[in-house]
Amino acid sequence: MITGEPVMVMHGGPGAGSHSSATRFFDLQRYRVILFDQRGCGKSSPSASEDDATAALTDNTTRHLIDDVSALRHELNIDGKMHVFGGSWGSTLALAYAIAHPATVQTLILRGVFLCRRADVDYFFQGNAAEFAPDPLAMPVPGTYLDFPTAWRHFVDAIPPKDRGDIVKGLAKIFAVPPRTEAERARLVKAASACVAWEGSASRLNHDENSHGQPNGKYALTVARIMVYYMINGGFLDAKSEASRDNNYILDNVARLSGCACWATDIIPIEPHDCSPV
């Protein structure tokens, strides 16, 4: 029988899949670290990397993922409270799970907290895309692009100019149609790779702006499709109402977490991570 304090790891993306590197944050002699691939990605099937991703995106919402975590608890005989760990989208899912099932959460350990509000998504994806200027500093619109201008140009160049008024909607339009020819598939992979490369660039403090290596096509399709599908639906955070990009679900329900200890990790120059209670 496997013992140790259970830690449920929520991976990012959404769509990035789990990775064993997440275990390095824990003493495996003390903690039982649980990794799982969310619907449509990693080792889960069907995969969003297929030409037609309809099956992978059907019954794939935050509510379904929360139910999957509950099913895992049952399957792994976790009867008491557990630690819940996640970064970026993983922090979103961790918070949504804790709001739904606060009695099962001992601690929340979060990094790169993402609340999945329209303002958060627009800050990351939109920037000056509507009136794309080669010199991002010529545009006063705030956004992540100001910190990564070269990577931003590579990203926006993959989006048709007519669809840059709403980048997320434009990407959703591209990913909605299964490719019928190799040329169409190449365009699809190009857009997906640009999307994932941008996300990777803007998620790292030490990213080399002059490096524009593209992620694996299958991986890029998986992450980009699932990520855009969730972002355009506000992360499917409120199961009681229609999916919407205009919500503040987590902060509106944060009082439900009053019984959970919550730690947020801050990236600082000297050390990789520093934990402080919030």
Ranges and model annotations:
Residues 1-50:
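Conserved HGGG/HGGXW glycine-rich cap/lid loop of the alpha/beta-hydrolase fold
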Residues 63-82:
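Conserved acidic catalytic loop of the alpha/beta-hydrolase fold
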Residues 84-85, 264:
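Conserved alpha/beta-hydrolase fold motif
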Residues 91-102, 108:
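Short glycine-enriched nucleophile-adjacent loop
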Residues 103-173:
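A catalytic-pocket lid/entrance helix-loop region that shapes and gates access to the active site
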Residues 163-242:
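Alpha/beta-hydrolase fold active-site neighborhood
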Residues 238, 266-276:
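Conserved alpha/beta-hydrolase "acid-adjacent" motif
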Residues 257-259, 264-266:
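Short beta-strand/loop motif that positions the catalytic acidic residue
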